[in-house]
């Protein structure tokens, strides 16, 4: 048992010291802000929307009040909604800057979101904007968001500038699970490494991505990733081959989509967890074993172990609680939640297993009534 405790502790020492400082939450859009450019490039926001009637007015409304000095317009693609999303959007006062398209039927080989985005980017291309702002229909933006995005992109000559929208943490389930969702994402894709052109690590956050249009065309467009469930990270990887990218935390972009209970969060995570493992049962087995060692062994040894096993388990538990503190602080949560990380890790392990089971049953990648992982898993 002391060997297991020592392994868990060694893993957390590695994560704290050698994993790009992911846990420090230093990469944020309100730090090291870029100077404003002398010329403001043209931008078109592309918003895919499917059954978003409850939030579409707020999300699109936040785009229409952007304090952006350059040419800026919005293209919303109504992806066969059945709840009046398109009708509500058409009723907004867009002052001639909002165009609402009715999406075509989903062709084979495409995920729904990427197909809707592809139609929007094709329409936007008619105006030859320098940037495409890919954002979701359930995200609201502060008025200065686009101005800050463009300033950073122009200063760094970035091909993708992406913000990790702040998710809601109002319900008990959200408080327990949502900060850890971002923590785990940052662990998988350390933002410092994503932002380092010398490293191959690449990712993006789909809720807010400012993309240089010519670079996207050179990369093969959205068609190059048309069947990918984890569309944002695959877009980040595609675009990093074209130039530098940047990803950071923000309070300027916030999710309008609450998660009322554990079931909704489980569905959100399960949609893409098995895709993250390339639909491999062997990677799933290894991941489950790894999660047991990294998250569960420490508290078990700390409580029930003896001698060295207990002390290494306790040290590993303290290390993971320490690592969680900056993200808890960013989300305004008590430091005590850090000691719940083993429980949270166990729940996410269950969500990952659920994701695999859903894929095997033909319901993988479920999004807005569509099982999108079937072809990808074959």
Where are these regions (language model features)?
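A conserved acidic beta->alpha catalytic loop
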Residues: 69, 78-87, 104-106, 139
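Catalytic donor/gating beta->alpha subdomain of glycosyltransferases that bind UDP-sugars
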Residues: 153, 157-186, 214-217, 222-283, ...
């Amino acid at each position: 048992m002391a060997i297991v405790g020592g392994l868990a502790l060694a893993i957390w020492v590695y994560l704290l010291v050698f994993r790009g400082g992911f846990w420090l939450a230093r990469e944020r859009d309100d730090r090291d802000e870029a100077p404003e450019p002398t010329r403001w490039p043209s931008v078109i926001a592309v918003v895919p929307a499917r059954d978003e009637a409850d939030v579409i007015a707020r999300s699109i409304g936040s785009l229409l009040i952007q304090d952006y000095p350059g040419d800026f317009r919005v293209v919303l693609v109504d992806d066969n909604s059945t709840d009046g999303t398109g009708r509500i959007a058409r009723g907004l006062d867009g002052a001639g800057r909002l165009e609402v398209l009715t999406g075509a039927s989903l062709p084979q080989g495409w995920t729904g979101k990427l197909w809707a985005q592809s139609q929007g980017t094709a329409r936007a291309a008619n105006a030859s904007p320098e940037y495409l702002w890919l954002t979701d229909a359930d995200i609201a933006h502060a008025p200065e968001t686009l101005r800050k995005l463009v300033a950073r992109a122009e200063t760094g000559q970035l091909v993708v500038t992406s913000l990790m929208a702040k998710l809601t943490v109002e319900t008990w389930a959200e408080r327990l699970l949502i900060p850890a969702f971002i923590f785990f994402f940052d662990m998988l894709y350390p933002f410092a490494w994503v932002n380092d052109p010398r490293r191959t690590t690449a990712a993006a956050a789909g809720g807010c991505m400012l993309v240089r249009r010519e670079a996207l065309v050179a990369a093969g467009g959205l068609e190059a990733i048309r069947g990918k469930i984890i569309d944002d990270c695959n877009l980040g990887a595609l675009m990093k081959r074209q130039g530098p990218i940047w990803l950071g935390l923000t309070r300027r972009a916030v999710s309008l989509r609450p998660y009322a209970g554990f079931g909704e969060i489980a569905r959100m995570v399960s949609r893409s967890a098995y895709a993250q493992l390339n639909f491999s049962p062997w990677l799933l087995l290894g991941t489950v074993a790894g999660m047991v060692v990294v998250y569960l062994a420490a508290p078990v040894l700390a409580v029930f172990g003896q001698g060295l096993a207990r002390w290494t388990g306790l040290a590993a538990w303290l290390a993971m609680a320490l690592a969680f503190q900056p993200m808890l602080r960013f989300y305004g949560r008590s430091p005590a939640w850090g000691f719940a990380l083993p429980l949270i890790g166990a729940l996410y392990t269950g969500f990952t297993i659920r994701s695999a089971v859903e894929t095997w049953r033909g319901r993988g990648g479920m999004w807005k009534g569509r099982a999108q992982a079937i072809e990808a898993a074959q």
